[in-house]
Amino acid sequence: MKPIVEVFKTNVQHPELAEQIISILRRRLPVSRINFDLEVCDKILRVEGEQICVETIIEILSSRGLACEVLT
C-alpha cells in the first residue's frame, strides 16, 4: 500500500512546541512519519502514513490553541 502524505499549515513557532506536538501525534499515529518545517512562513506539519485522519490531527492542534489546516 502506498503511503498517504498530508501537509498542514500551522502557527507553531518554536521547536520545543513542535517536538511536543510530534510526540502527541506519534502516540495516535505510531507508524507514521511526522515532522515540522518551521523555517517556512506556513510552519509546515507533514504526516506520512498508510492511514491518516486529517480531522484528528486538526483537532489535536486546535485543542491546544494552535491553528492547523490542510495545505492545498
Where are these regions (language model features)?
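Short glycine-/aliphatic-rich beta-strand segments at the starts of folded cytosolic domains
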Residues: 1-13
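A short linear hydrophobic-aromatic micro-motif
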Residues: 30-36
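A generic structural motif
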Residues: 43-47
